[in-house]
UniProtKB/Swiss-Prot annotation:
Identification of the protein by name: Small ribosomal subunit protein uS12
Gene that produces this protein: rpsL
UniProt KW rRNA-binding keyword: yes
UniProtKB keywords: Ribonucleoprotein, Ribosomal protein, RNA-binding, rRNA-binding, tRNA-binding
InterPro entries given in the database record: NA-bd_OB-fold, Ribosomal_uS12, Ribosomal_uS12_bac
Entry annotated with the keyword Coiled coil: no
Chain segments annotated as coiled-coil in the UniProt record: none
Function comment: With S4 and S5 plays an important role in translational accuracy. Interacts with and stabilizes bases of the 16S rRNA that are involved in tRNA selection in the A site and with the mRNA backbone. Located at the interface of the 30S and 50S subunits, it traverses the body of the 30S subunit contacting proteins on the other side and probably holding the rRNA structure together. The combined cluster of proteins S8, S12 and S17 appears to hold together the shoulder and platform of the 30S subunit.
């Protein structure tokens, strides 16, 4: 507990808040070659590498990920959700924030069903998350 004199001389410090997805908060202006902080929910980018990665300990799998060069100049690692994908090198994708807990360094997720990333086939639950259209009713 600080004394009154300590509070008068220094005051209370505001807690510094750090974003968990920094690449979404910067915009690059190519005319004057400067970056400006304008937060955005999504960013577009081009895939430079598509590969698999093994998760941290107790889990075991081959998780699919892509290195994406964003429109603001950042290059980030993004997770490809769902079973099966059609993403290749030079595919244009949309990314959103959202880390994958068991993949170190993966802070972004690719949005399925937009740009070059197709939705997950034969998916009936949580369809909006995986960009799948509503199935036609069987008559």
């Amino acid at each position: 507990m600080p004394t009154i004199n300590q509070l008068v001389s220094q005051g209370r410090k505001k807690k510094v808040w750090k974003t968990s997805s920094p690449a979404l908060s910067l915009v690059y202006n190519s005319l004057n070659k400067k970056q400006t902080e304008i937060p955005a929910p999504f960013k577009r980018g081009v895939c430079t590498r598509v590969a698999t990665m093994t998760p941290k300990k107790p889990n075991s799998a081959l998780r699919k990920y892509a290195r994406v060069k964003l429109s603001n100049g950042f290059e980030v690692t993004a997770y490809i959700p769902g079973e099966g994908h059609n993403i290749q090198e030079h595919s244009v994708v949309l990314i959103r924030g959202g880390r994958v807990k068991d993949l170190p360094g993966v802070r972004y997720t690719i949005v399925r069903g937009t740009q070059d990333a197709a939705g997950v086939a034969n998916r009936n639950q949580s369809r909006s998350r995986y960009g799948t259209k509503k199935p036609k009713p069987k008559s």
